[in-house]
C-alpha cells in the first residue's frame, strides 16, 4: 500500500510560493532574453522589407544584361519603362491590378515586383539611353514604407559598349537614398 504524505505536507506543496530571490532571477532571465530577441527581430523584420527593392533591381539588371548580350549596342536595351505602378504604395504593401506589368520592357525582362496577386511595397522603373557605340540603363525602385510621403530610392546602372571585352554589365554598387522612408 502506498504511503501518503501527511495532510500538512500536501497543503504546503500545493500552496508553494516563489521567494523574492527566485522571482528576481526569473525576471532577469526573461528580461535578458527579451533584450536580445526583440532588437534582433525588429532589425530582421525591417531588413526583410528592404529585400524587395534590392532583389527586384538585381533581377532587372540580370535581365537587362542577358537582353543586351543578344543584340548590337545600338539596340542593347529595351525602351524605357515608366514607374510601375505609377504611384508607389504609401505606408503599406499592395497587390497590383491585373495588367500593371504589361509594358513591353517588363515582358521582355519577364519581370513583376511580386507574384500575381501578392502585395509589394515598391514601384520600379527602367530608363535606357541608346547610342551607336555605347548604351546605358538606369533601373530604380521607389517606396514609402512609413507612409509619410517621403520616398526611398534604390538605383542601379549598367552599360554595353562596342569593343568592351567584358560585354554588357551592371555597374558595381547600388545608389540608396533614404532607405527607411
Predicted regions and their residues:
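N-terminal single-pass transmembrane signal-anchor helix
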Residues: 13-45
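Acidic, glycine-anchored loop motifs typical of Ca2+
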Residues: 144-151
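Low-complexity, S/T/G/P-rich flexible repeat/linker segments used as non-globular hinges
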Residues: 151-181
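Short amphipathic beta-strand and strand-loop transition segments with alternating hydrophobic
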Residues: 122-132
